């Protein structure tokens, strides 16, 4: 089958699919100890809370409502309002439901953000995503619709006792310019 360039890019192996295959293999291997991604440290009390909540939703008919009805394009209004209220009350943020975007997870959220702020622009220029600290999460590597979407800088490496080390952003070497579409600061350690 012949795909478009988009299809070719998104049907080949990528960092995130390899990572997710490894996580899936670990979950299916008896006795494996999950020390990486994929929710490695589930909290029994939270699992019990979610099970109870789902049971209540099932008994009240809310599970069918949640699974079988479409929400608005921005997400479920009740959830957006509750999130905005929580962020205002807990953190003092001047935020409303219109400032919140719900996605299918962080991987798709970063895909949208990277391609919204970086890549080829209408004026012919190209902007990039700057990672001020590397190494970075492998799942980002294939998130651009175009190749060479990302740039990064080497960190300062602080050597610590017992063979440990810590990365620090080298603020003096950050290549921030007109071609910087966004700066992505993340430490996805679950």
Model features per residue range: what roles?
Residues 1-74, 89, 166-190:
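N-terminal "arm"/small-domain region of PLP-dependent enzymes with the aminotransferase-like
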């Amino acid at each position: 089958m012949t795909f478009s360039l988009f299809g070719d890019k998104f049907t080949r192996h990528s960092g995130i699919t390899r990572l997710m295959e490894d996580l899936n293999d670990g979950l299916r291997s008896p006795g494996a100890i999950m020390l990486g991604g994929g929710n490695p440290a589930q909290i029994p009390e939270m699992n019990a809370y979610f099970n109870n909540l789902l049971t209540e939703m099932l008994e009240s008919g809310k599970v069918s409502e949640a699974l079988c009805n479409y929400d608005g394009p921005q997400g479920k209004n009740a959830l957006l309002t509750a999130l905005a209220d929580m962020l205002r009350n807990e953190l003092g943020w001047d935020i409303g439901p219109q400032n919140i975007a719900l996605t299918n997870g962080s991987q798709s959220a970063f895909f949208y953000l990277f391609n919204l702020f970086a890549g080829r622009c209408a004026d012919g220029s190209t902007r990039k995503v700057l990672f001020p600290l590397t190494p970075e999460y492998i799942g980002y590597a294939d998130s651009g619709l175009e190749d060479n979407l990302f740039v990064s800088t080497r960190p300062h490496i602080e050597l610590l006792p017992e063979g440990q080390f810590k990365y620090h952003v080298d603020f003096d070497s950050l290549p921030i310019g007109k071609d910087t579409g966004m700066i992505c600061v993340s430490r996805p350690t679950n």
